[in-house]
UniProtKB/Swiss-Prot annotation:
Protein name, as recorded: Outer capsid glycoprotein VP7
HAMAP family: Rota_VP7 (MF_04130), Rota_VP7_A (MF_04131)
Family statement: Belongs to the rotavirus VP7 family.
Compartment(s): Virion; Host endoplasmic reticulum lumen
Keyword Calcium found: yes
PTM (free text): Intramolecular disulfide bonds.
Disulfide bonds: C82-C135, C165-C249, C191-C244, C196-C207
Functional note: Calcium-binding protein that interacts with rotavirus cell receptors once the initial attachment by VP4 has been achieved. Rotavirus attachment and entry into the host cell probably involves multiple sequential contacts between the outer capsid proteins VP4 and VP7, and the cell receptors. Following entry into the host cell, low intracellular or intravesicular Ca(2+) concentration probably causes the calcium-stabilized VP7 trimers to dissociate from the virion. This step is probably necessary for the membrane-disrupting entry step and the release of VP4, which is locked onto the virion by VP7.
Any one Gene Ontology cellular component term annotated for this protein: host cell endoplasmic reticulum lumen
Main location class: virion
GPR motif as annotated region, ranges: 253-255
Species, as recorded: Rotavirus A (strain RVA/Human/United States/DS-1/1976/G2P1B[4]) (RV-A)
MF annotations from Gene Ontology: metal ion binding
Length: 326
C-alpha cells in the first residue's frame, strides 16, 4: 500500500522536473531565435529605404512641430494631399469617375495614386467652425459670393489660422479682450452684435447697461462676425441669441499646411489687414471662372507651386498663412 503511494508521488515529482526542464529548453531556444532575429534587423536596417511608421500621430491639420520623414526626402512620395470642395462642384460635374480622373492627372504631377483625397462640404460656414484637416497638405476651394464678401474674408481667417475658443455666457458675465489675438467670433443665420464698454465702476462708457438701444452696433445682420474691441476693457455684449452664437477665441497662429483657393470674384479677398496676421502678405493666383472642371484642371496644374509655399503638418507663430485666388 505504502509502496504504491510512494511510487505515485515519485512519478509526480519526476513529471514536474521533466516539465520544468522542457519549459526551460523552449525558453532558451526562443530567446536565441528572437535575439538572432533582432540582430539581423539591426544589421540590415541602415541599408533599407522604407517609410518610418514607428510613430503614430492623429493628424487634425495642425501640430506644434514638424515631423519629417526620416528615411526619404521625396516630398510627394511620402505625403498626403486633401482637396476640399463645395458639394455643388460634384453635382455640376455629374461623373462617377471624376475623382479617379483627377487622381490620374495628379499622378502626372508626381502625386501617386492614393495620396490625394477629395472631400466635399455642403456649407463653408459650418466647415470653417471646426475644419477637419486630415492630410499633410490641405487645399480648400471656396466659391466667391459677392453678397457676403466680408463673411468670406473672415471665413478664410478662421480656416487659415488655428483658434482656441470657449463659449460665452453674455447674460451673466462681462467680457474683455486681453490681446490683439483675442477675438469674439459670432456665427449664425442672422448676427447683430452690440457692445457697451464699461469703466472700473462697471458703468457704461457712452451707453447705459440697462438699455441695449444705447449700445454700439459693431455688426448687423451678418452670418459671421469677428469682433475686435479695445483690449483690457470690460464690455457688456448683446446679440440676437435666437439666430446667433458667440465664442471667446484666441488666435494661436497660422495653419501652415492649409491653403485656400478662392474660386471666382473680381478681386482677391484681403485678410492681411488684421495686425495679428504676420507677416502682412498674401499670395494670389488668377484665372477666369468658367466651370468646375476648369477649376480642377487649374488646381492640378499649379498644385506643386502651391505646396512649395506651405509647410507639412505644421503650425508656426512666426510664419505666414497663404490665400490663393483662381
Amino acid at each position: 500500500m505504502y509502496g504504491i503511494e510512494y511510487t505515485t508521488i515519485l512519478t509526480i515529482l519526476i513529471s514536474i522536473i521533466l516539465l520544468n526542464y522542457i519549459l526551460k529548453t523552449i525558453t532558451n531556444t526562443m530567446d536565441y531565435i528572437i535575439f538572432r532575429f533582432l540582430l539581423l534587423i539591426a544589421l540590415i536596417s541602415p541599408f533599407v529605404r522604407t517609410q518610418n511608421y514607428g510613430m503614430y500621430l492623429p493628424i487634425t491639420g495642425s501640430l506644434d512641430a514638424v515631423y519629417t520623414n526620416s528615411t526619404s526626402g521625396e516630398p510627394f512620395l511620402t505625403s498626403t494631399l486633401c482637396l476640399y470642395y463645395p458639394a455643388e462642384a460634384k453635382n455640376e460635374i455629374s461623373d462617377d469617375e471624376w475623382e479617379n480622373t483627377l487622381s490620374q492627372l495628379f499622378l502626372t504631377k508626381g502625386w501617386p495614386i492614393g495620396s490625394v483625397y477629395f472631400k466635399d462640404y455642403n456649407d463653408i460656414n459650418t466647415f470653417s467652425v471646426n475644419p477637419q484637416l486630415y492630410c499633410d497638405y490641405n487645399v480648400v476651394l471656396m466659391r466667391y459670393d459677392n453678397t457676403s464678401e466680408l463673411d468670406a474674408s473672415e471665413l478664410a481667417d478662421l480656416i487659415l489660422n488655428e483658434w482656441l475658443c470657449n463659449p460665452m455666457d453674455i447674460s451673466l458675465y462681462y467680457y474683455q479682450q486681453s490681446s490683439e489675438s483675442n477675438k469674439w467670433i459670432s456665427m449664425g443665420t442672422d448676427c447683430t452684435v452690440k457692445v457697451c464698454p464699461l469703466n472700473t465702476q462697471t458703468l457704461g462708457i457712452g451707453c447705459k447697461t440697462t438699455d441695449v438701444n444705447t449700445f454700439e452696433i459693431v455688426a448687423s445682420s451678418e452670418k459671421l462676425v469677428i469682433t475686435d474691441v479695445v483690449n483690457g476693457v470690460n464690455h457688456k455684449i448683446n446679440i440676437s441669441i435666437n439666430t446667433c452664437t458667440i465664442r471667446n477665441c484666441n488666435k494661436l497662429g497660422p495653419r501652415e499646411n492649409v491653403a485656400i483657393i478662392q474660386v471666382g470674384g473680381p478681386n482677391a479677398l484681403d485678410i492681411t489687414a488684421d495686425p495679428t496676421t504676420v507677416p502682412q502678405v498674401q499670395r494670389i493666383m488668377r484665372i477666369n471662372w468658367k466651370k468646375w472642371w476648369q477649376v480642377f484642371y487649374t488646381v492640378v496644374d499649379y498644385i506643386n507651386q502651391v505646396i512649395q509655399v506651405m509647410s507639412k503638418r505644421s503650425r508656426s507663430l512666426d510664419a505666414a498663412a497663404f490665400y490663393y485666388r483662381i
